[in-house]
Curated annotation (Swiss-Prot):
GO biological process, one term: L-proline biosynthetic process
Source organism of this protein record: Dinoroseobacter shibae (strain DSM 16493 / NCIMB 14021 / DFL 12)
Protein's gene: proB
Reactions accelerated catalytically: L-glutamate + ATP = L-glutamyl 5-phosphate + ADP
Domain PUA: 278-355
Protein function: Catalyzes the transfer of a phosphate group to glutamate to form L-glutamate 5-phosphate.
GO molecular function, one term: RNA binding
Pfam families attached to this UniProt entry: AA_kinase (PF00696), PUA (PF01472)
Residues where substrate binds: 54, 141, 153
SUPFAM superfamilies in alphabetical order: Carbamate kinase-like, PUA domain-like
Primary residence: cytoplasm
Localization, UniProt: Cytoplasm
UniProt cross-references to InterPro entries, sorted A to Z: AceGlu_kinase-like_sf (IPR036393), Asp/Glu/Uridylate_kinase (IPR001048), G5K_ProB (IPR041739), Glu/AcGlu_kinase (IPR001057), Glu_5kinase (IPR011529), Glu_5kinase/COase_Synthase (IPR005715), Glutamate_5-kinase_CS (IPR019797), PUA (IPR002478)
The protein's name: Glutamate 5-kinase
Domain of life: Bacteria
Length: 368
């Protein structure tokens, strides 16, 4: 069974119904302060934390006096634009006393489907975490029309977990897990402590959303669980309204854990190995030896580039004698790779005329 105390990189999804009081539209300050304490304690144990937070529309509509009913798309986008500033400031203010630097990252589901944007987002999240920053991620509701209409922050949180290589994802919800039936209407409903596989029978147990401000129901949570599990990330659904919800989960609060069969890095490498390559990159003997020691591929070690590929595309890595070493996702196009082959990373900007990544294929984006 996965436990929160074992997390190496944790993603936490926070819904509008937890963050914003439904009646007044005001921020639940005491609850957020307690969450900040939880985050500080988890980080103190050496784990990275990413928060995926809804709430911009809910906060913005109060400022604009738009009431609590359903909003036309244009008003929802306007409310998101106004509320996003307040949401980011709220997190900054509660985490600053713990000496935690926050960053605002706005994404959409498309950032996980377009390979170039996927790699850029992944690199940004990785850099922020390496610098000790806690990213506050929200979908870009001002432009992401589909996400506003359907409310997919559960799936977005799962995609963020995949991009960050997280090993645990927690969905703070208005229920304490997955039940055999709706516990609000069926007194015989029982909660699952653990799910190892999402079967059609499990999917049939998903109900509809009941919260007034959030739109995600159990169906989107199961979709998130499938995405997370496929990437080797464990996921928990637990009731989030209680004070210090993450501490409560660590102390044994009721939850449903979705447990994967593999770890995030192994799952990612399996995915890369199955992709159809778009080109080939030949490396010299020094680079070949470095790759076998688990290093990333630098431009200096490249001797030949063939094929037409873009940033984020899969390529085959060849040894000097032409044998296949493995596959990886390139951070440069074929044209760029040809230009910088044999050059040191410090020379990339001079060659291309603009700054670039230090490595051509990162070791986490490579399978040998």
């Amino acid at each position: 069974m996965a436990t929160l105390s074992a997390a190496r990189c944790l993603v936490v999804k926070i819904g509008s119904a937890l963050l914003v009081d439904q009646a007044s539209g005001a921020l639940r300050q005491d609850w957020l302060t307690g969450l900040a304490q939880d985050v500080a304690e988890i980080r103190a144990r050496g784990a990275d934390v990413i928060l995926v937070s809804s709430g911009s529309i809910a906060l913005g509509r109060r400022v604009l006096g738009l009431g609590t009913g359903a909003l036309p798309l244009e008003q929802a986008q306007a409310a998101a634009a106004v509320g996003q500033i307040r949401l980011a400031r709220a997190y900054e203010e509660v985490l600053a006393p713990h000496k935690i630097t926050t960053a605002q990252v706005l994404v959409t589901l498309e950032d996980s489907t377009d390979r170039r944007r996927y790699l850029n987002t992944r690199a940004t999240l990785g850099t922020l975490l390496s610098l000790g920053v806690t990213p506050i991620v929200n979908e870009n509701d001002t432009i992401a029309t589909d996400e506003i209409r359907y409310g997919d922050n559960d799936r977005l949180a799962a995609q963020v977990a995949v991009m960050a290589g997280a090993d645990q994802l927690v969905l703070l919800s208005d229920v304490d897990g997955l039940y055999t039936a709706n516990p609000a209407t069926d007194p015989t409903a029982t909660r699952f402590d653990r799910v190892d596989e999402i079967t059609p029978e499990i999917e049939a147990m998903a109900g509809d959303a009941v919260s007034g401000l959030s739109k995600g129901g159990m169906k989107t949570k199961l979709m998130a669980a499938r995405t997370a599990m496929d990437a080797g990330c464990a996921m928990a659904i637990t009731e989030g309204a209680r004070p210090r919800p993450l501490k409560a989960l660590m102390d044994g609060a009721p939850a449903t854990w979705f447990v994967p069969r593999t770890d995030p890095l192994a799952a990612r490498k399996h995915w890369i190995a199955a992709m159809k390559p778009r080109g080939e990159i030949t490396v010299d003997a020094g680079a070949c030896a470095a790759l076998k020691r688990g290093k990333s591929l630098l431009p200096a070690g490249i001797t030949e580039v063939s094929g037409a590929f873009g940033r984020g595309d899969p390529v085959i890595i060849l040894a000097p004698d032409g044998t296949a070493l493995g596959r990886g996702l390139t951070r440069y196009t074929a044209v760029e790779a040809r230009a910088i082959r044999g050059h040191r990373s410090a020379e990339i900007e001079a060659v291309l005329g603009y700054p670039g990544r230090a490595v051509l294929i990162h070791r986490d984006d490579m399978v040998l």
